[in-house]
Amino acid sequence: MLTFQAFIQSPGETFLNLGFITIRWYGLLISVSVLIGLFISKKLAKARNINPEYISEILPSLIIFSIIGARAYYVIFEWRQYSGENFFTSLELFNNAIKIPSFLAVWEGGIAIHGGLIGGLISIIFFCKSKKIHLKTFIDILIPSIILGQSIGRWGNFFNNEAFGIPTNLPWKLFIPIQNRPLEFINYEFFHPTFLYESLWNLLVFIFLILIFNKQNKTDFFRPGFISCLYLICYSFGRFWIEGLRTDPLCIGGLPPFCDGGIRMAQFISIFLFSSGLIGIFFLRLRTYIGKNRKNG
């Protein structure tokens, strides 16, 4: 009797191998995210009467600071992966293998979005101060592109066979090759596609933020900074629950896959960011309320 079993499977991390250079899906997706984000952010900047060229100007430093932050954050909490005999890895370039420190091999995966957000925020603060741009307005312009980039970038985890969830037999289950499975789940073939959950959630958040952005100038309810706060709330809410399914968490005081005796760092940060978003909205509304009373008084 024939049986049909549906599942998702990565075709591999390589998009194109030209012999002298290899293009990986992860790098390609990041590049696509940057180009789409550049286009969207310029449109949003123009809608807020901010010079769209500022987006092009900040882009190099934003990318560099975000990648450094994302990688540093991950390496700090997963140093055991990059120490000892794993300290070096090979970079194939023009048919030659060059040894480099493994923590520099970002294209192999291993970045943390919370670290990227910290690095990106530092870059934005410095840029806004140098150009004398209103910080909250400028961040509101960039935020939709950031969450869309997160949605696209999550597919890099799919191609790298990483950042997946606990075993499952759901129709949309993800097949993971044995060499990529945690030892605790070595005999399981199918796992939750947490990359897909987060990608879809982030896409919904992007659509929601764009709708709010288009209403921001029509009412004083959505003050500058409101979109940034909504991002913190919505993204953190989804990330908290999805993180609970993952088998590769960064842990404080524990070890993957369940951080026994400790806490999942991403969930801890999500609670902090969620709370920060709520507090931010409270103070934005308070300023609006005080401003109205002063006008009426």
Swiss-Prot record:
Protein's membrane topology: Multi-pass membrane protein
Pathway(s) the chain acts in: Protein modification; lipoprotein biosynthesis (diacylglyceryl transfer)
Keyword Cell inner membrane appears in the UniProt entry: yes
Binding positions for a 1,2-diacyl-sn-glycero-3-phospho-(1'-sn-glycerol) per the UniProt entry: 154
EC numbers, comma separated: 2.5.1.145
GO molecular function: phosphatidylglycerol-prolipoprotein diacylglyceryl transferase activity
Pfam families from the UniProt entry: LGT
Subcellular location: Cell inner membrane
Family: Belongs to the Lgt family.
Function: Catalyzes the transfer of the diacylglyceryl group from phosphatidylglycerol to the sulfhydryl group of the N-terminal cysteine of a prolipoprotein, the first step in the formation of mature lipoproteins.
Name under which the protein is recorded: Phosphatidylglycerol--prolipoprotein diacylglyceryl transferase
Organism: Prochlorococcus marinus (strain MIT 9301)
